[in-house]
Amino acid sequence: MASRKEALARRANRVRRHLKSVANGRPRLSVHRSSKNIYAQVIDDVAGKTLAAASTLDKDLRGSLKTGADTAAAALVGKLVAERASKAGVTDVVFDRGAFIYHGRIKALADAAREGGLTF
């Protein structure tokens, strides 16, 4: 039986394999959630470059947050990454949730990124 870490890695690889088939050259909005923070970055896989990034550890957000581990913090990160992506000229992305289910903080970040101007 696979360990929890192996199962998460397998699920993340399955999601990314599907994304590559539907991406059509679009950059991906990759999300990582830890117990204390949330991170998001827009990655151009063709060029191998990060186009925009934001997290609850950014100086812009750190002072205004009570904690980096709630849906309000995730929504602020989503709005910030959408703003930075639009400055980089990116509006259309594919959403890479990794091994995380689309619920709670991940959903809050995605909804805020959509409101900020990203389409996926």
Curated annotation (Swiss-Prot):
Coiled-coil spans in chain: none
Gene Ontology CC annotation, any one: cytosolic large ribosomal subunit
Molecular-function GO terms, alphabetical: 5S rRNA binding; structural constituent of ribosome
Subunit details: Part of the 50S ribosomal subunit; part of the 5S rRNA/L5/L18/L25 subcomplex. Contacts the 5S and 23S rRNAs.
Record function comment: This is one of the proteins that bind and probably mediate the attachment of the 5S RNA into the large ribosomal subunit, where it forms part of the central protuberance.
HAMAP family (alphabetical): Ribosomal_uL18_B
UniProt cross-references to PANTHER family, sorted A to Z: 39S RIBOSOMAL PROTEIN L18, MITOCHONDRIAL, LARGE RIBOSOMAL SUBUNIT PROTEIN UL18M
Family listed: Belongs to the universal ribosomal protein uL18 family.
Stated name of the protein: Large ribosomal subunit protein uL18
Gene: rplR
